[in-house]
C-alpha cells in the first residue's frame, strides 16, 4: 500500500466535514448529518424544485416506519411512491420489473428523478433501474441502514441477484447525491445494526486500525447508538471508501481490498439461504481470512483473538457450522469452476492487505476448521 494513500486518508479523516465530494466522471456529494431536515438543503444545492417530477422507491418495512415523513415530502414536492417487499430474497429481476412497470404507468421521463430510500437492497435495485430506464435517469440515494450508509451507498455498484448468485447482473452508476442521516439508525433493529458493524471492522483491518480501537473503547456507546459515535463511524468509513474508489472506480485492482472477508462471506450467505446476514457473513469470512493470513504470512495470532473478543462484545457471530463442504466450496467457486485455487484478500498485518492471493481447497478447509467451524 502507498504511504501517500494513508497520509491522505488520515488527513481527511481528522477533518470534521459533513459533506464529502466523490471525484470521478460524475462527481457527486455525500451529505452526512443527524438531522433529516437537512435533505431540503441538498435539494436546494442540486436545484431540485417543488415541481420537479420525482419517484420515491422503498421497501414495505421502511415505508411503514417513515410513512409520515414521506407524506411530508409529498406535501412539498411532486413525488409518487412505490414500495416492494423487504429482504435480500427480493433483490430479483421480478422486483425490477415491478419498478419498471410503476415508472412506465406513471409516465416517468428522462428528466424525472428517482429516490432510493432504504438499505442496500433498495439502493442496489433502484440504482440499477436508474442506470437502465430510458438509458439512464438521475437518482438520489438515501440509505437507512448502517451497512448501506458506510459502504454500499458509495462506489457506483448497482445490480440484482440472479439464480441465487449475489449481484451477478449489474453495472456502475453514480447518484446525483447521497444523503445520510444517522437518525435513521435509531429505528434500525439490533440485528440490522450489528450487520453493519462487521463491515466497519473490515475497514479497520484493511485501512485504519484506529476504527477498531475506537469501537473497542466505545462499544457501549456504539451499541446504544450515541449520535457522536455514529457520526464518527459513518464519516470515517465513507472517507476511507471514497479514497479507494477514486483510485480504482471499476474495481480492476486496488479496490479489491474491500472484498476482505467476502469470499467466504458470500458462500456463508448462499449456503445459509440468507439466514446469516451479509454483515455477519463477512464478519465470519474475515475470521477465516485472518486464519489463512496466519498460515500464509505468519500474521500475529493475537489479532484473531482480539477480533473474536470484539465480535462477542458487539453480538457478531464467531461460529458457523459447515455441514456440506462440497456445496460450500461450490458456493465459493461458482464462477471459477475450472480453477483449482480461489483468490482471497489476506493481511500481512493490520492495514497491510494483499489482493488476489491464490489459496487451494485444502488450505481453505484447514482455515475453516481452525476458525469458525
From Swiss-Prot:
Please list the residues that bind NAD(+). Answer: 120-124, 144-145, 157, 166, 184-187
List the GO cellular component terms. Answer: cytoplasm
* UniProt enzyme class: lyase
List positions binding Zn(2+). Answer: 199, 262, 278
Q: Does this UniProt record's set of keywords contain NAD?
A: yes
- Task performed by this protein: Catalyzes the conversion of 3-deoxy-D-arabino-heptulosonate 7-phosphate (DAHP) to dehydroquinate (DHQ).
Q: What keywords appear on the UniProt entry?
A: Amino-acid biosynthesis, Aromatic amino acid biosynthesis, Cobalt, Cytoplasm, Lyase, Metal-binding, NAD, Nucleotide-binding, Zinc
The family database entries (PANTHER family) matched by this protein are listed as: 3-DEHYDROQUINATE SYNTHASE (PTHR43622:SF1)
Q: What is its main location?
A: cytoplasm
Q: How is the cofactor bound?
A: Binds 1 divalent metal cation per subunit. Can use either Co(2+) or Zn(2+).
Pfam families, per this entry?
DHQ_synthase (PF01761), DHQS_C (PF24621)
Q: What is its EC number?
A: 4.2.3.4
The record's NCBIfam families line, in alphabetical order, gives: aroB
Provide the protein's localization.
Cytoplasm
From the UniProt record, which GO molecular function terms apply?
Answer: 3-dehydroquinate synthase activity; metal ion binding; nucleotide binding
What protein name applies here? 3-dehydroquinate synthase
